[in-house]
A protein has these predicted regions:
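A glycine-/small-polar-enriched, mobile loop at the entrance of the PLP active site in fold-type I
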Residues: 2-53
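Conserved N-terminal alpha-helix of the aminotransferase class I/II PLP-enzyme fold
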Residues: 32-78, 85, 99-100, 108
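Conserved PLP-anchoring active-site segment centered on the Schiff-base-forming lysine
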Residues: 88-101
Length: 356
């Protein structure tokens, strides 16, 4: 029986990707070697890295002004790395606080220099995206998080600003088209819509670097990795390889535009049931609901949770528990999630209603 995996991350990936990756663990590129034991300097892996970078550029229409990197350390390392590269000693970084990850990014910058929060939805447990805030055009940068997995909110329109725009797109990159030219830095951990944990995708505007005027540790300097083609040190070979396979799959299935249509269809199916069914309630403001992560509660948990959880288990639905900090339920619907899996969850919700 199929398991419907709604885990927030590490995420579901296409079965075709799993199949090819598993074969390459035994014999990669007909070398008689595993992909995880080949040299990262070999022609075979250099070709993988080159194709992965080319596919990122193709799918997101990355302009020539920007570089594409595959780094390590996760998005969490980017919190400090971006501050080292963009925050000057006498300048300031501005942050939109929409959840746990943006808050952590702000704290890293505040430990290095002048950082300030321009708006926050913490007062309402991060259940909406703030609007109508002012950004200082003279700030060193403005940072936002496009999608919030814990609270189920998503930025639908990015702010217009003269300040360099930086965004953590870890949980919704490649789920919709993005105008990369408007951003000085985009970063994303691979383990949502791209591949297994271990690689971090970075898209950085070359002309934005070298201006902070501070000492930058070698490994935290974007220019270090640009100059070496993401191979200053040994890259996360397997994660980059699987990410490349996922990007191939994405392109073969209509690209980012087609992914957006599928994601909106899946999200609409689930949110319509949440709104229709009197036993459930959504937690995020309707206008800010994420297409990637739908968060919801039972109206009467004491009366219905045990039954609903048993029904979910019987249907082989996995990973729908809400984040430990908020509870409830969370259905993560990344690119590789089939509509049939969302329909299976919706059927459970309808069955619960019929029981009571």
């Amino acid at each position: 029986m199929k398991t419907h995996n709604f885990s927030a991350g590490p995420c579901i990936l296409p079965q075709e990707v799993f199949k090819e990756a598993s074969e390459s663990l035994i014999n990669f590129d007909n070398l008689g070697l595993s992909v995880i034991e080949i040299s990262h300097r070999s022609k075979s892996f250099v070709a993988v890295m080159d194709e992965a970078v080319a596919l990122v550029k193709d799918q997101l229409q990355v302009p020539d002004t920007h570089e594409v990197l595959f780094l390590q350390g996760g998005a969490s390392m980017q919190f400090a790395m971006l501050a080292f590269n963009f925050l000057s000693e006498n300048g300031k970084g501005q942050y939109l606080d929409t959840g746990a990850w943006s808050s952590k990014a702000y704290k890293e910058a505040a430990g290095l220099g002048n950082a300030e929060v321009v708006a926050s939805s913490k007062d309402a447990n991060y259940n909406y995206i703030p609007k109508g805030y002012a950004i200082d055009d003279n700030a060193d940068y403005f940072h936002c998080t496009s999608n919030n997995t814990i609270y189920g909110t998503q930025i639908k329109e990015f702010p217009q600003t003269e300040a360099p725009l930086i965004c953590d797109m870890s949980s919704d990159i490649f789920s919709r088209p993005v105008d990369v030219s408007k951003f000085d830095l985009i970063y994303a951990g691979a383990q949502k819509n791209l591949g297994p944990a271990g690689a971090t995708l970075v898209i950085v505007k070359k002309g934005a670097l070298g201006k902070s005027g501070r000492y930058i540790p070698t490994m935290l300097d974007y220019n270090t990795h640009i100059s070496k083609g993401s191979m200053f040190n040994t890259p996360p070979v397997f994660s980059v390889y699987v990410s490349m396979l996922t990007l191939r799959w994405l392109k073969a299935n209509g690209g980012v535009e087609a992914a957006q249509q599928r994601n909106e269809e899946k999200a609409a199916l689930l949110y319509n049931e949440i709104d229709r069914n009197p036993l459930f309630v959504g937690t995020a403001a309707v206008e800010d609901r994420s297409t990637m992560n739908a968060c919801f509660l039972l109206n009467d948990e004491a009366a219905h949770k045990e039954t609903f959880d048993a029904m979910i288990a019987e249907k082989n639905i996995s990973g729908v528990n809400g984040h430990r900090s908020v509870g409830g339920y969370r259905a993560s619907m990344y690119n590789a999630m089939d509509l049939d899996s969302v329909a299976a969850l919706v059927d459970c919700m309808k069955e619960l209603e019929n029981k009571f």
